[in-house]
């Protein structure tokens, strides 16, 4: 689906992970554009998404803490500031601890104060809303007591997704959108991912009985998302048959 085909004030929750501007090798997108142009692009899509959500609509935005390659940039701070500037209201930030410090390959100046790199193995999930935080309607929640207690802790500990296994340069695990969806939306709510990628958000929508909408400009990634959704549906049917 094209984003212009989505009706305004119709989305309950947006969960997405946009291009990071850190030189990830996407097929149809240059992820190494000048940083000021990247921020202009960010402002444009954030404003468009603001018009799509309901007055009590929410946004869960997965972004990096910073950018070291090609010059240090405070990506999290800059994008959060832009989101507020275009009209989003800030609620909180969740720290996603990917626990992948062992995959580090660069330290800058090794064992020297000359120019060391400090790299945190975390990403950020910025939680924002349009006009009011409290939901206008009372829906059905499907979050358990244990999930609620764990997920309202602002540090989430789980691993990332294997890009080779999934076939996408920057997939996020289904666990990430699933947590956001169950914590910040009701059953049957409409969830949008404007950067669908490999389809993790729509798989999470299937798991949680939400109505999912995905937007993706790359045909190959669209086909990958459809393939994963079909495989998930087949797996679910097999589980039902076994049970």
Which residues make up each language-model segment?
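S-adenosyl-L-methionine
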Residues: 1-4, 226-243
């Amino acid at each position: 689906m094209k984003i212009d085909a989505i009706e305004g004030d119709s989305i309950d929750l947006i969960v997405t992970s946009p291009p990071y501007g850190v030189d990830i090798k996407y097929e149809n997108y240059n992820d190494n554009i000048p940083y000021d142009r990247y921020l202009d692009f960010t402002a444009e899509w954030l404003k468009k998404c603001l018009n799509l959500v309901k007055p009590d609509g929410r946004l869960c935005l997965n972004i990096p803490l910073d950018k070291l390659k090609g010059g240090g940039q405070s990506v999290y701070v800059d994008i959060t500031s832009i989101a507020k500037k275009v009209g989003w209201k800030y609620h909180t930030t969740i720290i996603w601890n990917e626990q992948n410090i062992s995959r580090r390959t660069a330290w800058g100046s090794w064992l020297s104060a000359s120019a060391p790199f400090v790299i945190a193995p975390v990403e950020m999930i910025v939680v924002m809303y349009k006009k009011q935080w409290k939901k206008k309607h009372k829906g059905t929640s499907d979050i358990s007591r244990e999930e609620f207690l764990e997920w309202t802790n602002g540090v989430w500990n789980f691993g990332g997704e294997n890009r080779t296994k999934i076939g996408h340069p920057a997939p996020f695990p289904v666990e990430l959108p699933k947590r956001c969806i169950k914590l910040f939306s009701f059953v049957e709510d409409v969830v949008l991912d404007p950067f669908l990628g490999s389809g993790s958000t729509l798989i999470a929508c299937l798991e949680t009985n939400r109505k999912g909408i995905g937007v993706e400009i790359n045909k190959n990634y669209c086909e990958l998302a459809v393939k994963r959704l079909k495989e998930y549906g087949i797996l679910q049917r097999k589980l039902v048959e076994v049970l």
